[in-house]
Amino acid sequence: MLLIDVGNSHVVFGIQGENGGRVCVRELFRLAPDARKTQDEYSLLIHALCERAGVGRASLRDAFISSVVPVLTKTVADAVAQISGVQPVVFGPWAYEHLPVRIPEPVRAEIGTDLVANAVAAYVHFRSACVVVDCGTALTFTAVDGTGLIQGVAIAPGLRTAVQSLHTGTAQLPLVPLALPDSVLGKDTTHAVQAGVVRGTLFVIRAMIAQCQKELGCRCAAVITGGLSRLFSSEVDFPPIDAQLTLSGLAHIARLVPTSLLPPATVSGSSGN
């Protein structure tokens, strides 16, 4: 199964397989989202990258999409259908009743499907209260209690968003590369911004996980994901990093939702019209 996570920073493509009966996923490639690209342009690009990754049309029996960029959802879905002959299923609130996590109102009305996928993957893995930290365009924290209820979400500016904002919102601060410095005391402007933004985010993550545990009233497992989570891979005494968490969640969800309950326009193999 082809898994697609359409986000604000990247469109991530992965493929699902099984290992000893367990769901496993492999990221294939990432694209920069571009609303100016046509369906045909996306189709040619996705086809070429799938071929390069060794994934032919015969391997794409089904496709499952999460998207938080509505303007791209149909374009990407139709591009995949054009290549594979399979109309992707687009994950949405229609599937929430069939998940191992529960989503109460008003969270249900606004939570992104990527965060739901994260919560599903984490809860299936830990089977206990957990906090998922996603380091993407936004820095998000999703808290799930021991019964599988999503208690809430916190959203802060992401790392790249923060450095871009400092650059565009000031007269002299440069656009600095993202890196984790050893010290919080910068010796030049680049180091100072990296210390404040990247190492500062590290402290925010630790503090927010601790506060989530306090508000949930229990110790929680924690996991870090997102395209920029790699910046913290050298940290000790830090939650594990799982860059494939969102794709893993989509794979679990795709297996859990009965085909008979899929919206007619998104049943795999339908015309999609």
From Swiss-Prot:
Biological process (GO), any one: coenzyme A biosynthetic process
GO molecular function, one term: metal ion binding
InterPro entries: ATPase_NBD, Type_III_PanK
Class of enzymatic activity (EC top level): transferase
Keywords: ATP-binding, Coenzyme A biosynthesis, Cytoplasm, Kinase, Metal-binding, Nucleotide-binding, Potassium, Transferase
Binding-site positions, substrate: G112, T113, D114, L115, T189
Transmembrane segments: none
Location (main, coarse): cytoplasm
Disulphide-bridged cysteine pairs: none
First and last residue of the signal peptide: none
Cofactor binding note from Swiss-Prot or TrEMBL: A monovalent cation. Ammonium or potassium.
Residue sites binding K(+) per the record: D134
NCBIfam families: baf
Entry similarity comment: Belongs to the type III pantothenate kinase family.
Chain's role: Catalyzes the phosphorylation of pantothenate (Pan), the first step in CoA biosynthesis.
Protein name: Type III pantothenate kinase
